[in-house]
């Protein structure tokens, strides 16, 4: 069985499959992805594969520099996005935006 390259919480699976979620914001541990990478995507909860994505762009961001566009690409409001990031990465202040398209 082939390993997944990146995982997402199951609650984001439907938005990714529908093309409503087109970025992910990660910490330094996942800052190595680069445009052109093709990644197998699994669910965080059970590592079950659900699609393949291609990385189209990467950039860095802080909570203070998040924009409404980032929120739109995550399919949530800016307030929701900041809250989710603080819940997942409570001790971090610098993040890595990975833009992608589903293949």
UniProtKB/Swiss-Prot annotation:
One GO molecular-function entry: N4-acetylcytidine amidohydrolase activity
Transmembrane segments: none
Keywords carried by this UniProt record: Hydrolase
EC number, UniProt record: 3.5.1.135
Catalytic reactions on record: N(4)-acetylcytidine + H2O = cytidine + acetate + H(+); N(4)-acetyl-2'-deoxycytidine + H2O = 2'-deoxycytidine + acetate + H(+); N(4)-acetylcytosine + H2O = cytosine + acetate + H(+)
Active site: 21 (proton acceptor), 24 (nucleophile), 74 (proton donor)
Any one GO CC term of the record: cytosol
The ASCH domain, residue ranges: 6-100
InterPro entries: AC4CH, ASCH_domain, PUA-like_sf
Family affiliation: Belongs to the N(4)-acetylcytidine amidohydrolase family.
Its biological purpose: Catalyzes the hydrolysis of N(4)-acetylcytidine (ac4C).
NCBIfam families: PRK04980.1
Protein's UniProt name: N(4)-acetylcytidine amidohydrolase
Organism annotation: Klebsiella pneumoniae (strain 342)
């Amino acid at each position: 069985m082939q390993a997944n390259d990146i995982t997402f919480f199951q609650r984001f699976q439907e938005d990714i499959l529908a093309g409503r979620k087109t970025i992910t914001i990660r910490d330094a541990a996942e800052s190595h992805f680069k445009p052109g990478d093709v990644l197998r995507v699994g669910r965080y909860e059970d590592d079950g594969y659900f699609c393949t994505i291609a990385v189209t762009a990467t950039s860095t961001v802080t909570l203070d520099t998040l924009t409404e566009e980032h929120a739109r690409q995550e399919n949530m409001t800016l307030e929701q996005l900041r809250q989710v990031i603080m819940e997942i990465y409570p001790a971090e202040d610098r993040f890595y935006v990975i833009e992608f398209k589903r293949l």
